[in-house]
């Protein structure tokens, strides 16, 4: 047993001091001197029975150290030289004694390069059937208690059967002990792999050691299980790696004295073998989802064979996975026929919507073909192009061609550019190949992520970026979609498809092939056709639409008039080539009609001078209309004649004082009869005419305009009018009265308001009559609240400016005012207030 322990001593290298620089003295355990004497006594006999250990010296020089700085290079040279010296000194003892009972030095933490620290070193290979030396320390601080003495006879592991077939080599010459042989040797510098697996040289003669897991328990100890070695595969470390080693009492937990590096190593290596998920190193531009390999028998010639992975391993080689995943869908590795097929698909597109729909269809089609390997076996030259014309309802309003770029895309006109390969797009690009010229994000369903949702071309349409809702391109695509729905019907994509009624034939009648095919075609035209917002963004303009309309209209050609009806208004050429509209100043016309009266007719063609009256005739007509109005008060006749006079002045371009007089006369007649529509039209024309032809009645009609704004409660125009009032206009009696009336109305001073109403100049009272009843209702509520319990009717009559008592009583009765039973001449304020509130 002691011989077995002696074989382990030459394979360990230990630093001296607190760090890799070897500073600080190290004290020797007295028990180790006895062990060395026992090892030296049996070195010759053991050396003859273990010939295979001679490989250790040869393989010790095969280290490939990944050293990046000068200090790490010095450490490599130091440990390599020290390791070779120890192998020469203890060449006949392949099993290190301190693997089972390690004795680290009293000192500081691990040197750089151990457990994830930069500057790792390769572990030397060992003969067949022998385990390499492993560091078993979690902490090397000086707080550890002394190491207990090792047992006398440890049980060695079973020897490989191949080692006994070789003749024993001659024993090496004795080597004098090293100067520091009394110190225990440190563990070998072994780089820590990110996957938790110790790398070994691929040139190792023993294939069993390539998948060797140093965390396995050795035979002869409690909890040992027979390891299963798998060549050319990596294994995840055992949960208890380095767990029971170190200078720690068995009764105390190992994590009590762990340093920070040991805790991180334990968290990374505590996962059991076989329970970790396969991890992939995603390339710079992922084209397909990871963790999807082709079956071995269906791979095309351009695909690399998938790397065999061990089911029990916790990770996969990042290089192999990245190269395999990138080669699956890189457009450079596509078959030439498939590239030409993609180019033909985009060439057949007529609009940007067709390109977007084609790109979405090709993404799912090519991805499914590349995954099942059929992309390298089918004939792409005979593959039919996708059908992009959607099924449109006969009741659906098709958008105009000029509106397609604005309605279908939310107002943003998109250019086509970005990631293209030749003349076709990269349909597996993660970002959209087309960008929005307006700067807004146009998210179409091109992202490979199945969990992200983007806004569709219509602002009310939503579509899933990872769903198989791209329509029927061919029978193979339809079958592949059916297989996906049957297999992944419980996934998120299928649930969202079922939620919007787009998962094949489900939700629209089972067992009907026609409806199933219609569903697939509806998916090609866009999801959510019946949703809120319509389908304006997904319709396409038919170039033959107008021709079809004309052909349908030709059925009634015999019933139409022989000559088309042409309206000649505004069709004559305007002078100076102006296209801003008809201006009567640019088309001077002098009338020749001598009729005093003329019916008013709207113009439907260019004015005829023979039907237009000149200005002298119009003056006579105005005098006749005034006389007829005073004698007959026929407003219909007067209004028709005044509008006829205004029309003749307009077509001749007459804007003189006579024009102002005509509009003022018409405004007064309309105001007297209460036609505020015609009055408002005349006021608008007078406001423009007063700038060119000032009149003595500017103040009068300015006051009418202010009172009219009070009637309409147009505070904005009223404020604007007050701003432009000059000092001369404010001094005008009509304007001054209108300003006082506005102030009383704005302040709610009803007493002053009705006093001004009774003193209104000229025709201002006609305008106030338009809203005086409204103001009387508000004033009556205020009176009833102020004069409880009763108020006389005479006071109300005088306060509200009624002309007589009968008119006041009629007004009060209409509002439901209650009078006191004892005195009918008084109003019951309490009861009347309630009736006014409810009315």
Swiss-Prot record:
It holds the Pfam family SAC3_GANP. Residues 408-420 have a biased composition (Gly residues). Residues 145-189 have a biased composition (Pro residues). InterPro entries: PCI_dom, SAC3/GANP/THP3, SAC3/GANP/THP3_conserved. PROSITE patterns: PCI. Residues 451-462 have a biased composition (Basic residues). GO terms for cellular component: nucleus. Residues 1-75, 106-262, 287-332, 400-553 are annotated as: Disordered. Residues 675-839 form the PCI domain. Residues 53-66, 120-132, 305-327, 429-450, 465-476 have a biased composition (Low complexity). Residues 25-36, 492-508, 539-549 have a biased composition (Basic and acidic residues). Residues 10-22, 40-52, 223-236, 253-262 have a biased composition (Polar residues). This is Leukocyte receptor cluster member 8 homolog. It comes from Danio rerio.
């Amino acid at each position: 047993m002691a011989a077995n322990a002696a074989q382990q001593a030459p394979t360990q290298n230990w630093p001296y001091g607190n760090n890799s620089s070897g500073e600080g003295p190290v004290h020797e355990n007295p028990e180790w001197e006895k062990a060395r004497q026992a090892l030296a006594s049996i070195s010759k006999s053991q050396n003859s029975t273990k010939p295979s250990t001679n490989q250790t010296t040869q393989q010790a020089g095969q280290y490939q150290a990944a050293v990046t700085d000068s200090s790490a290079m010095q450490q490599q040279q130091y440990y390599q030289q020290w390791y070779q010296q120890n192998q020469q000194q203890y060449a006949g003892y392949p099993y290190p004694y301190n693997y089972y009972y390690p004795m680290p030095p009293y000192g500081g933490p691990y040197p750089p390069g151990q457990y994830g620290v930069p500057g790792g070193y390769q572990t030397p290979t060992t003969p067949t059937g022998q385990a390499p030396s492993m560091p078993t320390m979690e902490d090397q601080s000086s707080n550890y208690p002394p190491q207990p003495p090792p047992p006398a006879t440890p049980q060695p592991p079973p020897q490989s059967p191949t080692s006994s077939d070789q003749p024993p080599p001659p024993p090496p010459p004795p080597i004098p002990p090293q100067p520091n042989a009394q110190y225990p040797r440190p563990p070998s510098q072994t780089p820590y792999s990110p996957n938790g697996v110790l790398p070994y040289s691929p040139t190792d003669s023993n294939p069993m050691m390539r998948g060797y897991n140093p965390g396995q328990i050795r035979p002869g100890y409690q909890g040992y299980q027979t390891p299963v070695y798998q060549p050319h595969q990596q294994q995840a470390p055992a949960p208890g790696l380095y767990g029971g080693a170190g200078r720690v009492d068995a009764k105390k937990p190992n994590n009590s004295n762990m340093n920070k590096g040991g805790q991180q190593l334990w968290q990374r290596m505590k996962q059991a073998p076989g329970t970790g998920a396969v991890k992939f190193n995603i390339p710079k531009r992922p084209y397909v989802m990871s963790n999807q390999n082709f079956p071995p028998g269906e791979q095309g010639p351009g695909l690399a064979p998938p790397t065999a992975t061990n089911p029990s391993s916790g990770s996969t080689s990042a290089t192999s996975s990245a190269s395999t995943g990138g080669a699956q869908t890189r457009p450079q590795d596509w078959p030439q026929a498939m590239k030409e097929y993609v180019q033909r698909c985009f060439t057949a597109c007529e609009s940007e919507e067709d390109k977007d729909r084609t790109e979405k269809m090709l993404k799912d089609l090519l991805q499914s073909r590349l995954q099942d390997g059929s992309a390298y076996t089918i004939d792409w030259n005979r593959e039919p192009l996708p059908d992009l014309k959607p099924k449109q309802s006969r009741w659906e309003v098709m958008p105009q061609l000029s509106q397609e770029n604005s309605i279908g895309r939310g107002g943003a006109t998109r250019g086509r550019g970005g990631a293209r390969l030749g003349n076709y797009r990269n349909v597996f690009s993660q970002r959209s190949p087309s960008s929005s010229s307006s700067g807004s994000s146009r998210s179409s369903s091109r992202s490979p992520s199945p969990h992200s949702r983007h806004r569709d071309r219509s602002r009310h349409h939503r579509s899933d970026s990872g769903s198989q809702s791209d329509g029927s391109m061919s029978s193979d695509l339809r079958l592949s979609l059916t297989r996906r729905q049957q297999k992944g019907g419980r996934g998120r994509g299928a649930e969202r498809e079922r939620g919007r009624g787009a998962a094949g034939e489900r939700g629209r009648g089972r067992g009907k092939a026609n409806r199933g095919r219609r569903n697939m075609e509806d998916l090609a035209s866009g999801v959510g056709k019946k949703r809120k917002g319509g389908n304006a963004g997904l319709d396409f303009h038919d170039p033959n639409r107008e021709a079809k309309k004309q052909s349908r209209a030709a059925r009634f050609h015999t019933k139409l008039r022989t000559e088309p009806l042409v309206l000649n208004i505004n069709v004559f050429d305007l002078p100076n080539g102006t296209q801003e509209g008809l201006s009567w100043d640019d088309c001077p016309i002098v009338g020749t009609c001598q009729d005093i009266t003329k019916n008013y007719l709207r113009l439907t063609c260019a004015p005829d001078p023979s039907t237009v009256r000149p200005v002298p005739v119009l003056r006579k007509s105005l005098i006749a209309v005034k006389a007829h109005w005073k004698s007959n008060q026929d407003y219909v006749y007067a209004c028709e004649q005044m509008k006829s006079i205004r029309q003749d002045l307009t077509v001749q371009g007459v804007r003189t004082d006579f024009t102002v007089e005509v509009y003022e006369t018409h405004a007064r007649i309309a105001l007297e009869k209460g036609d505020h529509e015609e009055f408002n039209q005349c006021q608008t024309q007078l406001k423009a005419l007063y700038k060119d032809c000032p009149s003595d009645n500017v103040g009068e009609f300015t006051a009418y305009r202010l009172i009219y704004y009070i009637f309409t409660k147009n505070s904005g125009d009223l404020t604007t009018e007050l701003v432009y009032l000059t000092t001369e206009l404010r001094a005008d009696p009509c304007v001054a009265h209108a300003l006082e009336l506005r102030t009383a109305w704005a302040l709610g001073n009803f007493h002053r308001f009705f006093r001004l109403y009774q003193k209104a100049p000229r025709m201002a009272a006609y305008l106030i009559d338009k809203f005086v009843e409204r103001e009387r209702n508000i004033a009556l509520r205020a009176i009833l609240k102020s004069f409880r319990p009763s108020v006389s009717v005479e006071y109300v009559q005088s306060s509200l400016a009624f002309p007589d008592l009968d008119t006041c009583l009629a007004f009060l009765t209409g509002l439901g005012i209650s009078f006191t039973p004892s005195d009918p001449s008084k109003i019951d304020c309490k009861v009347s207030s309630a009736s006014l509130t409810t009315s």
